[in-house]
């Protein structure tokens, strides 16, 4: 340094004097009114440092009177006369005026330039331990209870059979007694959905799909009276399933109509009145037999009976269907041990009987059942008809005992009505038409053979023996049925409790989801580790702009895009499972009168626990490695909101795509969101294309802007933030709006 210059380098034009005093965030120990701040040419070593993309701030001033930004690990109070080491419990990044207080449980030693937040990691560990205890704790106690129950039964001289159940303080309940209690629960006053006096009439029903143009169903007029047990038979492709869909409101006939008590009934009203047991066993696999049946009963008759009465009824229903031994067993699914095919069929029937319907339609309820079990199911259904319930049963060549239980018989062939009348008179009707039946043969087998050989067969209908009962007004019946259902808010609570219980049973996928969130947080954190929390560098405020090193605006926008990408990877596939695996269950429940809104809200609320835990693990590891200036709560809120967005998008995708394609489409959607985050192409370019509206309907833009604000707001005293915001066309002063738009 020469005697007449204060700069380290004197051969490049000397100092450029400044007219301002020391700005906040700078260290100016030698400046005064007589010696104002000045800018000196950099030394070769400092010049090389300033040419670096990152870590480009020189450690020392280039002259006696040149200000230097306050170094990391120190803070410089207003005036810039002192550079003080950062105290313990605080951290001081580049240009600190007042030390930033560390969040609770963070690692901040004396002289820290960044905060290492450990609160999230500690919360994650504690919550993980708690969840492990919750999931594993019931098992030893369940084993003890099972052992005690076994000793009690052996001591009482009983056994664990399907014919009875033992509970504390109660005697053994027999199969026949349970069947009696079930039939008595179907009261004849209509207050529980039975609505005695209901009469079903179909008039000129036909179905001709527009695509094929082939008539699949063509019926003459028919009436089904209250208390009738009607069997529907016919060869494959005869229109039995089509008839079931029309009668239950699942399909709209091309011509004709279905009448209830003489009034035309719309499809939605039919779904309210009738209970359908589909041929496929559509049941939630992660719940037990009792839990599935109880849920159905609580939703559909929750307003008419006390919960204790519903539980007692479900107990009797389980025993009467021979499910007592498996009442606490999970339903299971393909490749996962659960119930047998016959047991699943009986649970399928119990789900609809739990609603105490006035009309129940069953599509092949005896398929997959052994002879004795099939007969017991038919006997239970027969007992319900004595309470005025209409039972319509699609059966395929039943045994003699089952055929004898039928009151009426409807025979279909190629969609046309062959016979509709008394089941007992059907054989005689065929014989009167000139057909013979072999001795000691099952008449249903012979009838099926005859229809298979004669496509245009039509027999005279024989009158039914069931007398007409006094009819109730259809509107009164509909009101009584809707009145007994659980209120909407109760259905939300029930759906939430069911969804939460499912989460506890899906712990392998639950653990994988949390580990994925933690892994994604580690990956993005490692990509930022070398920056030591210094993710943004802008131009210093005037007149110190010439002291600025190259700016790094793009790093922060890239950070927002990476956040969107990694959160999409962590939350997308998991979000598909929320609704995608239950689509068929939802459709069945929706057609049975369950509130669709209550289901979606309750299910969504039950997933908030998973969303929070995934976001917590992601944020904890991300912040430990990235160590940004952003506080742990603020970063957690932003990440949590984007997790919620991805879950919502994945849920909508799963509702309109197949389970096979859902995860792939969700990942592609997440990548699309990242592309529309405003990083590349920049929002400045997008605005020139007049396509900014497309970017702003994407949640990734809003999380990127929220991330931008969280990093730049605390440094606004040091850097001129406006040029950085204009470079990316970011709204740097509306953080509160970002959270709203993300949601």
Swiss-Prot record:
Subcellular location: Membrane
Disulfide topology: none
Superkingdom as given in the UniProt entry: Eukaryota
Regions that span the bilayer: 124-144, 507-527, 560-580, 611-631, 636-656, 661-681
Keyword line: ATP-binding, Glycoprotein, Membrane, Nucleotide-binding, Transmembrane, Transmembrane helix, Transport
Residues that bind ATP: 234-241
ABC transporter domain boundaries: 200-439
Assigned GO CC terms: membrane
Primary location: membrane
Protein name: ABC-type transporter claG
Entry similarity comment: Belongs to the ABC transporter superfamily. ABCG family.
UniProt organism field: Penicillium crustosum
Coiled coil stretches, renumbered: none
Membrane topology: Multi-pass membrane protein
PANTHER family: ABC TRANSPORTER G FAMILY MEMBER 28
PROSITE patterns for the chain: ABC_TRANSPORTER_1 (PS00211), ABC_TRANSPORTER_2 (PS50893)
